[in-house]
Amino acid sequence: VDARERGEGNGVEYVFARKSIAAGDVAGLRPGVLEGVITGISWPKSCRWGTTSEYCSRPVRWLVALLDERVIPVRFAGLTAGNLTRGHRFLAPGPHGVATAADLLGVVEAAHVVSSEQAREAVIREGVAQAEQRTGARAELPEKTLLEVVNLCEQPTVLVGTFDEEFLRVPEEIIVDAMLMHQRYFPLYDADGKLTNNFIVVSNGDPAHADTITGGNERVVRARLSDAKFFYEEDLKHPLETYVDRLDEVVFQETLGTMKEKADRIVALAKHLAADAQLSEADAADAERAAYLAKADLVTNAVVEFTSVQGVMGSYYAAACGESDQVARAIADHYRPRFPGDEPPASDLGRIVATADKLATVRGLFALGQGPPGPPAPFALPRRAPRIAAMLDAGPHVTLAPAIAAPLDTT
């Protein structure tokens, strides 16, 4: 009580007390602190390793914890920290002794592990630039995939592989998806922006075996593209319209029903919006047709396997079975804008179908009481309204109120 004091913070008066704690051995305090740091790290995807209960992003095989030259006995996942680390699994696996904390980075660098994420990225970018110079092509390096690759490698080596030109007859989007999303390869484009049959792979293996590593990755991509080609050719055996009824096999949302029911709502909303926008009779018919076919590719082989090409594949299939260019383009564009800064569909018809798609989701979830504020909204709901607004800004002029107010089952 005698140690109490008064103080003010942010305009509020507080009563507090001061307590002095005697100095302690830092090394003795560190284990608990460091264990708390490790257990406090969370990942969207976690795993458990062996018989321990701790969660981690990848199995933890060893721990190093030093204060100067003293080992801090941190315990985690059944392991106790020491002063031994390991290097690149092929070039210098170790173990390697670490005399002091200051030596750690030097030890792992000498063991062929580039410890800095920024340094590994710089190595990859430099290797890609050299590959571009050798091939005369330009690489696509999406930030998300590049970040993954940077963190999959300890000592990256950039290699160039090749696949058979026959696969270039498959829609480019499937090839790119197979390489970027499934294999973490980077596609190469010629001076005209056309996809080539070369690709970049970043290896974490022994550079002395570059030819063997390249050949192995070429076999992998050949198998993946063979699957893509097969799926595409199988899908083309049936008109796009035949896939529409199969949307009844896909649940959109438990209460709102199947994707077929959502597709029916998109059609009805597109008719409302096309009439309100005073589209020509031909354009209104195309809007209704595009809305009817927009989700059909979700049950095709190619999209089931390569989900990021939804809409795009529907466009290819629509064109292949004789739908108009305008309908095919609207199918491809109806997911746009996909993210902030993405352009809305280029045509009035495309924007009508895209608005109908997003509006069908927004009003359905609001009808269920799942709109914000509240728990995290499903289907990225808070982002859909700004995307609808972006399309309204681009035209054509429509009034949403009648479409929003219409019954869900009849719109």
Model-derived regions, located:
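Amphipathic alpha-helical "coupling" segments that flank catalytic cores
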Residues: 1-411
